[in-house]
Amino acid sequence: MSREQAFEMLIKILCKTDSTDDMKLILECILTRSEMEDLIDRIRIYNELLNTSNSQREVASKLGVSITKITRGAANLQDNNIKDFLRKKISY
C-alpha cells in the first residue's frame, strides 16, 4: 500500500467514525502521546487566535507554547477558506 492509499484509508476511517469514544480510540491507536498533545495545542492555538484579539506573544504565554507554534497557526489562518472552516468547527 502506498502512502497516498494509506492516507485515503485514514480519511475514510475518520469520516466513518460517528462517536467521540470511537474517534478517541482511533486517535489513541495511531498517535503517540506527544503527537496527541501537539494536535491539542494546535486546536487551542486556533481557538485563541480566532476568538481573541491577543497578540501572538500573549497567546503563546497564555497557552504555554512556543511563539513558533503560534506563528505557524497564524500563518494557516491567512487562508480565508481555512479560517472560515476552523471558525465553524472549533470556535467556542
Curated annotation (Swiss-Prot):
GO terms for molecular function: DNA-binding transcription factor activity; sequence-specific DNA binding. One of its GO terms (biological process) is negative regulation of DNA-templated transcription. It is found in: Cytoplasm. Coiled coil: none annotated. It holds the Pfam family Trp_repressor. The keyword Nucleus does not apply. One of its GO terms (cellular component) is cytoplasm. Its main location: cytoplasm. Keywords: Cytoplasm, DNA-binding, Repressor, Transcription, Transcription regulation. The keyword DNA-binding applies. Gene3D superfamilies: TrpR-like. Residues 56-78 bind DNA. It comes from the Bacteria. Homodimer. This protein is an aporepressor. When complexed with L-tryptophan it binds the operator region of the trp operon and prevents the initiation of transcription. PANTHER family: TRP OPERON REPRESSOR. Belongs to the TrpR family. This is Trp operon repressor homolog. It comes from Xylella fastidiosa (strain Temecula1 / ATCC 700964). The gene is trpR.
